[in-house]
């Protein structure tokens, strides 16, 4: 009986010595984060009256998420995301629509876009002469 107890204790210590470090290593290794199929595209757009974002307080703000599907508080997220995709995310490349007639009254409106577009940080600010000029750009991106 003594030899059996000694043999069992030796076997248990050997198993612990061999398997113990493996168990600890498995517990210490963090699980890999699953890779996303889509690069993040989430933006916050604001509009306010003034010559710059620093001088204007935002009148309205909306969110726009474009991946994997268009969503957010923007009134037309699918169209706004399509506008951005059409210019490869380059907001400066958005042009005014043809045939829009605006008055020359100077009442500056500033628009900001901050967030991430296809995994890249975006920080954009533009001042338009008035609300009509702002609405003539980017068929739906700035229409909120």
Curated annotation (Swiss-Prot):
The gene is sti2. The record marks 104-105 as: Reactive bond. Residues 1-34 form the signal peptide. This is Trypsin inhibitor STI2. Its main location: secreted. It is found in: Secreted. Belongs to the protease inhibitor I16 (SSI) family. The lineage of its organism: Bacteria, Bacillati, Actinomycetota, Actinomycetes, Kitasatosporales. PROSITE patterns: SSI (PS00999). Gene3D superfamilies: Subtilisin inhibitor-like (3.30.350.10). GO terms for molecular function: serine-type endopeptidase inhibitor activity. Homodimer. InterPro entries: Prot_inh_I16_SSI, Prot_inh_SSI_I16_CS, Subtilisin_inhibitor, Subtilisin_inhibitor-like_sf. NCBIfam families: PRK13244.1-1 (NF009715). Keywords: Disulfide bond, Protease inhibitor, Secreted, Serine protease inhibitor, Signal. Inhibitory activity against trypsin. GO terms for cellular component: extracellular region. Disulfide bonds join 66-81, 102-132. The keyword Translocase does not apply.
